[in-house]
A protein has these predicted regions:
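Ordered alpha/beta subdomains of enzyme catalytic regions
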Residues: 1-236, 245, 357-401
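Glycine-rich phosphate/ribose-binding loops and adjacent secondary-structure elements
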Residues: 2, 211-401
Length: 401
């Protein structure tokens, strides 16, 4: 079986930026992650064994001088000490537990220092997705010529409509070749003539390097959720924004606000943070309703929302992005992160619906116990975590069922 992940930076930028801030602010924090397959997929016999071998192979994946040089050029906000850390970073199989039950369902857990395990999630999700297509024989049905042409058509529509967008598709891509093909098609289309819109780049750092594009991304829910587990959800957004400011000093200024819902975020989003952060990312809820909440919040602070960026990344496709662009452009500087719609859009192939969520955290290895955490989505009924933990967090935040 071929090795699926061969490059250290074949990963989303926000895993690296969060890793940097974790070391800077919570260097001794310990965490647990858990894999969730929302489709309850039955995996082929022996899948867990092969996935285990793929994870063990990560121990030989080390960052290269070329990757470091690229990040120094394109990610100038990263402090130089972080590149020294990455040079010495080594994956360990000891952080990961993989099993497959009698019904064929897959179970994956990570546990360890937050600064270590944070770089596993996206790589392991990409492994699971590609490995599933390999072991079920579907990989042979991936038509990359068709994907390239289809992606060019999508890009033409987005660019003509004035959309500013990026590829966000690493975690659930059909294969590395699929994402590489998509980014090549996006770049070729963008460079073919002048457009009303703009291709910003890709979340995948390695693919950004090979295509000489900007790597994009800031943070994921786990950053706020882990802090919520350690300190409680009421002030988690405040602590997260403060930690981000401490590390990046205003750079990487798009904040993902929906880890514990809009209401508590809004209470934490004071005028200094609203001025510091370039904008916000909408990743759940009704896009129009969420945008109107953001606009109203900025106005209440005396800030013109038209000067602020709003990144939409909530299960977008070409049609929904263009629709949002039409109404959002009058209220903000809209941009779009498009994932599976780009990197896993093949005839007769069902994209996987898989996530790995941070489920518990503790501030130091000295503590004898972890504190559970969860995510409270703006989509009703889509909270993630143990039911009793969700109830406890909702009670703490005075949220209604």
């Amino acid at each position: 079986m071929k090795q699926i992940i061969n490059h250290f930076t074949d990963d989303d930028l926000y895993k690296l930026s969060m890793c940097c801030s974790v070391i800077d602010n919570y260097p001794r924090a310990q965490v647990k992650y858990q894999f969730v397959d929302r489709n309850n997929t039955v995996y082929p016999t022996g899948f867990a064994d092969e996935l285990r071998r793929q994870i063990e192979a990560l121990e030989g994946v080390i960052i290269t001088d070329d990757e470091i040089d690229f990040m120094k050029r394109r990610c100038s906000y990263m402090p130089h000490w972080f590149f020294t850390y990455l040079r010495g970073y080594r994956f360990s199989r000891e952080w990961v537990n993989v099993s497959q039950d009698i019904d064929g369902h897959l179970h994956v857990e990570f546990e360890g220092s937050w600064s270590d395990t944070i770089l596993l999630e996206v790589k392991v999700l990409a492994m699971i997705s590609e490995l599933f297509y390999i072991m079920t024989g579907q990989i042979a049905r991936l038509d990359y010529v068709q994907l390239y042409n289809k992606t060019r058509q999508k890009a033409e529509r987005l660019l003509a409509a004035g959309c500013v967008f990026s590829d966000f598709g690493t975690r659930r891509r059909a294969s590395f070749e699929a994402e590489d093909t998509v980014v090549r098609a996006l770049k070729d289309t963008y460079q073919s003539r002048d457009w009303k819109g703009r291709l910003v780049g890709t979340s995948n750092v390695y693919i950004a390097m090979t295509h000489d594009l900007q790597p994009v991304g800031t943070m994921a829910h786990e950053f706020v959720c882990a802090i919520g587990g350690m300190f409680g959800p009421q002030m988690a957004n405040h602590l997260a924004m403060n930690a981000w400011r401490n590390t990046f000093r205003g750079a990487l200024g798009t904040y993902l606000y929906d880890s514990f819902g809009w209401d508590i975020f809004s209470l934490n989003f004071s005028e200094d943070f609203a001025n510091l952060f370039k904008g916000l990312r909408i990743d759940s809820g009704n896009n129009h309703e969420q945008l109107m909440k953001i606009v109203a919040k900025y106005r209440s602070l005396g800030i013109d929302s038209r000067t602020k960026q709003v990144v939409f990344s909530n299960a977008l496709n070409t049609d929904s992005a263009i629709e949002i662009q039409q109404y959002a452009k009058d209220y903000c500087l809209p941009s779009f992160g498009i994932g599976t719609h780009f990197t896993n859009d093949f005839e007769g192939i069902e994209p996987m619906n898989i996530v790995i969520k941070l489920v518990a955290s503790k501030i130091t290895e000295c503590w004898p116990y972890y504190n559970d955490t969860c995510k409270l989505s703006e989509d009703l009924g889509k909270h993630t975590g143990k039911p009793e933990v969700i109830r406890r967090f909702m009670e703490a935040l005075h949220m209604k069922e």
